[in-house]
């Protein structure tokens, strides 16, 4: 006799609070584990953290901060093509071994022009060139600090005499010595005709020493990814992002197991064969296989687990996150394609569980939405500091001019009142800097790997779980006590 359970229930769905990792024999110390992993087929990370392509999470400041820690940020697409490409460019110029395409300013421009460029590109100095791109001077923020005449030509304030320059063959160690000996902070790199071909800065050399684990490309620039949707201008957006320096493109939709997503993936790989294309979101091995067969370089996993997502209650669809992660992990064995576990993470222990279930990295939104570097608005409520945080399926995010309604396949809906949101908007407590948050997350991850005897993330995939009851969840949290001192890595579940 058939039954609903026998005919319709095809799997058990488990998520983070349903299980705990079983401690195992270990000869691994937390401080000795390696956190290196893959974001996509060709991009390595030094820590397994990716910041989400959300308009209250990742713009240039967040992407720079997470890349300096060793992860990567995905610039959201709720902006014009030009604005998103600019955010990518800002990240790529934030740090360099040598800046190969430095921002320059033409002789004859004004102080106002120079100040605007410094502000737009977050830089402190600009080489001045003539119409043939030959170096004629350099202007820095120190030259302009007390300059009140904004219409004054930069020729009158720039440094032009006894310019210290170097040539393309100079390595960074030699460049550092030149900077030190001449007590300067910027070293233009010129060719035999005195045309500028690069710029080496003291700040970049110092940053490289201070952040040795930063995630960088072969030119010494911070890595960054950028999100796109499935729209008529997707390829135009991709082209602008790739030209701006994006290391990877993330095709970001609510349902990656879709004909339209697959078609856009094929178009993207054909147009940009040398760029890694990440695709999501999915929740089954079948979906992941389909995407990889059509060229995906990484698969993003998660249908509705996020704190600001309502897909599971609005649409009745989803797979509890740990089961979804393992389903995709099992399907992708032997392909060399990593998976990104996206959503549902509240504590560092959840990160350990997500990676142990098969994730190569985790995508974080709420965990960093309250940081200084997030683009969310800072607000004061009842004397406490908060930052706004909203889902890309929220009404507020979808109804913007360049909003995210296409992510939920509602791109042709013109009236806001006709939109069907799959997310909410809210606020999260202010948390300080990304560096502080990531430090605690890494500490918890290292500890978990030590308990499991895993010296790297691939080894962590061999860890075993135990299913727990609601009583086990209660026992896992602090109990029978009034907390009088808050820990930086724990708050009671609401």
Language model: regions and residue ranges:
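Short beta->alpha transition motifs characteristic of CBS
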Residues: 75-80, 123, 127, 135-150, ...
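Glycine-rich phosphate-binding active-site loops on the catalytic face of alpha/beta enzymes
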Residues: 68-83, 246-258, 297-315, 345-379
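Alpha/beta catalytic cores of nucleotide-metabolism and tRNA/nucleoside-modifying enzymes
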Residues: 1-25, 105-106, 167, 227, ...
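Active-site-adjacent beta->alpha loops and helix N-cap segments on the catalytic face
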Residues: 31, 80-89, 147-151, 195-215, ...
